[in-house]
From Swiss-Prot:
The gene is eno. Binds a second Mg(2+) ion via substrate during catalysis. Belongs to the enolase family. PANTHER family: ENOLASE (PTHR11902:SF1). PROSITE patterns: ENOLASE (PS00164). This is Enolase. One of its GO terms (cellular component) is extracellular region.
Length: 424
């Protein structure tokens, strides 16, 4: 009844107009699952590799090769398998690929199959995905990290840091937190317009105004929070994605917008200064992806005061996370399903983090689709945090809307994480 009988792969477009892989998995009893794969702009060097076509078509970014691999080698390897045996399916693909970084089959091909199989298995059971994966204990609605100002690789402005986010930690429910975020977003738009600044939105729905420094961006967000009728640090906290690998050059953190340059110790002091000045509760990629000494120094300086999230540092890889836990680098992991390429490995990374006292943040990518799987995964794992962009663009709001549906399904059994999901 739950045997995989067919797999269909197609090339679709993501939110940036680039091709990506969508996969349908069909089962013997007629059950069905579908998943579309996201893609990043600023990618870590240690991420699993996407399969792209090369050549002139779509500027080399086509995924027809990946689709052929899904319908060919991958289908042959897992045809007839029980869709409810997720780990067996994922391990079969990992063995078939045979590389450390999924480079032979492509993480985009493998992930599409992995997630679609999970959706099909949930369909067999007649369960929503979060309940199928997480069981009866899946009931924590995550606190959102809402990206409202973009910089770095996500924007054409001088701001060195990639994302400036708000976290409505002081609201009583997910739906109220979402309303708060939307109201701050619109208050920020009004403030930027009044200052004569650009209010176009970037890849993740945040604004990309021409501001020169992190402090300028944080100041205008603080004003927007208050203008919307909320208290900074009480109702709404701040979070940063520094994406420091993007400006790490020859052992120095070069802030071109602010016209500053720091070694690891100096940059950790700079970040500490921001934490002292603003209600910042989370900093992502505060040090470069291979600056382990810098990460340890930053963690020693801010652990207990601020969540320190490893994205490029850990790339959702349990082996790199284990090294971080052992050496005292960071205190939380950003979880991106396409960084590792299978659902089983993603769940392993979350489990390792939470068991070790690390925080976990379920995350989108800058190139997204209408697929809302990560919303279900955030609830399934009870990780307590989700990062899925701003309060604009349907590729971002699709995840928030799915969480609203889940909140409604959970009813009184659901619990909003608030500040409790944070690692610090």
């Amino acid at each position: 009844m739950t045997a995989i009988t067919d797999i269909i792969a197609r090339e679709i477009l993501d939110s940036r107009g680039n091709p990506t892989v969508e996969v349908d998995v069909l089962l013997e009893d007629g059950s069905f699952g579908r998943a579309a794969v996201p893609s990043g702009a600023s990618t870590g060097a240690h991420e699993a590799v996407e399969m792209r076509d090369g050549g002139e078509r779509y500027g080399g970014k086509g995924v027809l090769k990946a689709c052929d691999l899904v319908e060919g080698e991958i289908f042959e390897a897992i045809a007839g398998m029980d869709a409810e045996d997720q780990r067996r399916i994922d391990e079969a693909m990992i063995e078939l690929d045979g590389t450390a970084n999924k480079s032979r089959l492509g993480a985009n091909a493998m992930l599409g199959v992995s997630l679609a199989a999970a959706h099909a298995a949930a369909d067999v059971q007649g369960l929503p995905l979060y309940r199928y994966i997480g069981g009866m204990n899946a009931r924590v609605l995550p606190t959102p990290m809402m990206n409202i100002i973009n910089g770095g690789a996500h924007a054409d402005n001088p701001i060195d840091f990639q994302e400036f986010m708000i976290m409505p930690v002081g609201l009583p429910s997910f739906s109220e937190a979402l309303r708060c975020g939307a109201e701050v977003f619109h208050a920020l738009k009004s403030r930027l317009k009044a200052d004569g600044l650009n209010t176009n939105v970037g890849d993740e729905g945040g604004f990309a105004p021409h501001l020169r420094s992190a402090e300028q961006a944080l100041d205008v967000i603080m004003d927007a929070i208050e203008a919307a009728g909320y208290k900074p640090g009480e109702d709404v906290a701040l979070a940063l994605d520094v994406a420091s690998t993007e400006f790490y050059k020859d052992g120095q953190y070069v802030l071109e917008g602010a016209d500053e340059s720091h070694d690891a110790e100096g940059f950790s002091q700079y970040l500490e200064k921001l934490v002292n000045k603003y209600p910042i509760v989370s900093i992502e990629d505060g040090m470069a992806e291979d600056d382990w000494d810098g990460w340890r120094a930053l963690t020693q300086r801010l652990d207990g005061r601020c969540q320190l999230v490893g994205d490029d540092l850990f790339v959702t890889n349990p082996e790199r996370l284990a090294k971080g836990i052992e050496t005292g680098a960071a205190n939380a992991i950003l979880v991106k399903v396409n960084q590792i390429g299978t659902l089983s490995e993603t769940l392993d990374a979350v489990d390792m983090a939470l068991r070790s006292g690390y925080g976990a943040v379920m995350s989108h990518r800058s190139g997204e689709t209408e697929d809302a799987t990560i919303a279900d995964l955030a609830v399934a794992t009870n990780c307590g945090q989700i990062k899925t962009g701003s309060l604009a663009r349907s590729d971002r709001t699709a995840k928030y809307n799915q969480l609203l549906r889940i909140e409604s399904l959970l009813g009184e059994t659901g619990m909003f994480a608030g500040p409790s999901g944070l690692a610090s």
